[in-house]
Regions:
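Periplasmic polypeptide-binding modules associated with outer-membrane biogenesis and secretion
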Residues: 1-180
Length: 180
């Protein structure tokens, strides 16, 4: 038998622009516990069963993110996943961020243990609120002679798990009397 030539046909991907018309037939929110579904749907109601530019949908989704931020959820946001808008179905993913793991760096065991306890308080809250992060971050900076830098990264997954880095440095204190 002779090998048959193989033909591979690839469909060109549709390039979306802000002006791309999007049919709005059904809105599906994936995830999210902070806001009632009815409240999330309300801004979309005027566009139901209509065709609108993509930029209108993006503006509404960005407004959800802005609401999370204004309500004190710094790691939470809304986004439109790829492979969306088929047959007028619009999926909006609500990522309610929290700290799932931490990386604590300190050259002092006592400071590291204290930072771990405070980080665990941050990790216990889902989704993380700004006030919880700030309160515990401020407490992290309390040990005299230590400089602490704590930051949490936005989650890069749909279930909201993010990371936090905490670095404590202590300047070397020289006791001149012991060197004489």
């Amino acid at each position: 038998t002779t090998p048959q030539p193989q033909v591979k046909v690839t469909r060109p991907e549709i390039q979306l622009t802000p002006e791309t018309p999007i049919a709005v037939k059904h809105i599906q929110f994936v995830g999210g516990t902070v806001y009632p579904l009815k409240e999330l749907l309300e801004p979309f109601r005027p566009y139901a069963q209509k065709t609108v530019p993509l930029k209108t949908i993006i503006t509404l989704v960005n407004a959800i993110t802005a609401r999370y931020q204004a309500d004190g959820y710094p790691l939470s946001y809304a986004w439109l996943p790829d492979n969306n808008f088929q047959d007028g179905n619009i999926r909006i993913v609500l990522v309610e961020g929290y700290v799932a793991h931490s990386d604590i760096q300190s050259d002092n065991n006592g400071t590291a243990a204290r930072l771990k306890r405070l980080t665990e308080k941050i990790m216990a809250e889902k989704p993380l609120r700004q006030e919880t992060f700030e309160r515990n971050s401020i407490l992290m900076t309390r040990p005299p002679g230590s400089k602490v830098d704590a930051n949490a990264q936005l989650p890069k997954n749909s279930y909201g798990a993010g990371g936090m880095k905490v670095k404590a440095t202590q300047p070397h204190i020289w006791d001149i009397s012991s060197t004489l």
